[in-house]
């Protein structure tokens, strides 16, 4: 039995169903959390709603529903099999102190089995509930609700905390039991003990309802919360595959257009199994993820740190597997166009940023292709001696040389090594990397945090000018511009910022003029002390990846610029003199560098 439902139908029906149940459809949030430094990407539908699940009132009310873009990077190396994905969409409905188990479970059952919605026979469903332990009682309430709705008692399974309990995220906090809903694929059971949660493939989880009803305290006790919440999640890709009777998410219409395009580029047909299918799935998943990251409202560019490193890694892994398939030359931009065409109606920001997405992919691909050819040749040259060794290990120093010289992420070298039956000395790589960092710091010890060489009047003036420059770049080039570094002395400023291409002569003139307009306006420079949360909510710009204290200083220059900063700054912009850009050049991949000076009255550059 299969249910012919497409991904777009599942998404629209889910939102429509819960709208009828008095839920407010809220928009999904950015794939890159703006105010949560603990994670690189939004990993679940509930992630953006954590403050509201913890008690903060949501402006849209107490019943919410949405579709959320998510990205998980823990299993990147597993991508290539039939099921693993990095990017996926999560459907979710929430009750913030409104309904609880009775209504939540009834809603799930009605959507899954109701004829206007999915129309699944209740006989194909099995559920799991919390079995209880010494700390919290067995969840008989959820089991009884399922049975009243029509799920046979033999299809209700009590599982331990490891399977049916959520939270807390730390040592203390909100938590509670959950109930998971599984679809019976119809394949024979693997054994007499086969049940939901078994890895044989007979049962596939399609929905999870989490009931936050307890708080775990520091003494280890669980106490009832004053306000109960419900958090649910259904992955679109997996659910569509299961309902369509497909053995793999990659066999659905979600991925077919991409796989067909990859097949056209490499001259191979997907579905013949073997290494080619694995590489096609890797390219398919990774270009989909990269397109959504690059198209996100919060800008991320390929780099060697944080979210940028994940982006660089999946792009470069795509390039390598494209070469394994026989694709010669650049190809990622054409695949991104397929992704954009599929999703632009739901996520219009992809079409809006299509040119930027294509440029970033082309730049990264072009840069890596040459290095990949040389690096693979170097790897093939040296690999025989490691294959002959008894340890069958690539030294960390060699892995670091591939990273430093050819831009091979450590994970790429490890992937090459696995294909050759080798392993990589990770500890040795870390040692070589740390030694390289130590050498890079020599000669830079005099620079204070924030890039200031001293706190003289001249250096302070350049510091304020840097804030004006940063905002001017964001106005002229776009809000994707982020500060990547600065070095400020009493003679000049040097400012590194994210931007995929050289600035045009006109853009440099516009930036220079905009900065000088603010200087001529003699704007006041004001400092406020506030919580980091208040600072971010007020629109202050902060350095991506920087670790801030809970209380920060925010410097505002009139209404033109507002940044989280430790200072010092001048009192008014009229003290700066004339701003002049001396040079604009590349600093690193996707990073530009400006050198500028301040001219006092009578000076000329």
From Swiss-Prot:
It is found in: Cytoplasm. InterPro entries: aa-tRNA-synth_II/BPL/LPL, Ala-tRNA-lgiase_IIc, Ala-tRNA-ligase_IIc_anticod-bd, Ala-tRNA-synth_IIc_core, Ala-tRNA-synth_IIc_N, Ala-tRNA_ligase, Ala_tRNA_ligase_euk/bac, Thr/Ala-tRNA-synth_IIc_edit. It comes from the Bacteria. It catalyses: tRNA(Ala) + L-alanine + ATP = L-alanyl-tRNA(Ala) + AMP + diphosphate. Gene3D superfamilies: 3.30.54.20, Bira Bifunctional Protein, Domain 2, Threonyl-trna Synthetase, Chain A, domain 2. Its main location: cytoplasm. The keyword Cell inner membrane does not apply. Consists of two domains; the N-terminal catalytic domain (in this organism this is shorter than usual) and the editing domain; the C-terminal C-Ala domain found in most orthologs is missing. The editing domain removes incorrectly charged amino acids. PANTHER family: ALANINE--TRNA LIGASE, CYTOPLASMIC, ALANYL-TRNA SYNTHETASE. Belongs to the class-II aminoacyl-tRNA synthetase family. NCBIfam families: alaS, PRK01584.1. This is Alanine--tRNA ligase. It comes from Treponema pallidum (strain Nichols). The lineage of its organism: Bacteria, Pseudomonadati, Spirochaetota, Spirochaetia, Spirochaetales.
